[in-house]
């Protein structure tokens, strides 16, 4: 009986030591989140599976659990994704504000937040273009000239945005950030497609990236869609 008890205790200790713990401590000043339930979801079996939940109380929430390996997750409010976060060993600090979200405190989260901040700056410059167009026209600038100048700016910003995403994914081919950002990038498409940016990313990707469940499923669907388009 004692041997059995020792075996059970040893097995429990081994299981705990073989798994890693994650702790995500969050805060928010968004009034609409107070009292709401947030969900932590990960991609599994072609779906976003909830693995934890936490209610926002006095602007605070917390996720805590055990994981077998580092995972890319998303914080959800109902069916809407609020922000991505990496579940890795260590204490992760999440901040949700009206205009910016961040996850810091661990290496991969720091890297992800820095990337999102840089991308947000480019997105803000793109969003400013219609306002610049209105200003230039109001100042009497020829409309054709306005379209030419702002069109060039838009193309340059789109190229800068694509390069930022591609370089970040390539720099993180062998960890969860690569497939995770690829999933974020392609989730905005109406349906899976292949374009020069995706082809460049895939052409140089190692097996770890290509065999990620989401990447693998996306490429299968995209190649099928492109084949159908070629038949028309």
Indicate residue ranges for each PLM-predicted region.
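Charged, long alpha-helical assembly modules
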Residues: 170-232
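A non-transmembrane, solvent-exposed segment enriched in polar/low-complexity residues
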Residues: 18-162
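A short, acidic, amphipathic alpha-helical segment used as a generic capping/interface helix at domain edges
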Residues: 163-170
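Bacterial Sec-dependent N-terminal signal peptides
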Residues: 1-28
């Amino acid at each position: 009986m004692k041997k059995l008890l020792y075996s059970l205790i040893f097995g429990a200790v081994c299981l705990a030591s073989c798994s890693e713990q994650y702790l995500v401590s969050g805060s928010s000043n968004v009034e609409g989140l107070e009292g709401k339930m947030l969900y932590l979801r990960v991609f599994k079996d072609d779906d976003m599976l909830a693995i934890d939940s936490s209610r926002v109380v006095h602007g605070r929430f917390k996720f805590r659990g055990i994981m077998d390996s580092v995972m890319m997750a998303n914080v959800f409010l109902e069916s809407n994704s609020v922000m991505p976060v990496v579940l890795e060993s260590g204490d992760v600090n999440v901040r949700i504000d009206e205009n910016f979200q961040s996850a810091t405190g661990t290496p991969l989260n720091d890297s992800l937040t820095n990337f999102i901040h840089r991308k947000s700056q480019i997105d803000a410059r793109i969003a400013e273009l219609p306002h610049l167009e209105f200003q230039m026209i109001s100042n009497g600038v020829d409309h054709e000239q306005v379209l030419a100048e702002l069109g060039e700016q838009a193309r340059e910003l789109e190229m800068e945005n694509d390069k930022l995403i591609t370089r970040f994914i390539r720099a993180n081919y062998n960890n969860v950030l690569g497939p995770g950002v690829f999933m974020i990038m392609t989730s905005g498409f109406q349906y899976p497609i292949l374009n020069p940016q995706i082809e460049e990313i895939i052409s140089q990707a190692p097996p770890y990236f290509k065999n990620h469940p989401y990447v693998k499923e996306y490429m299968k669907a995209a190649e099928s869609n492109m084949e159908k388009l070629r038949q028309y």
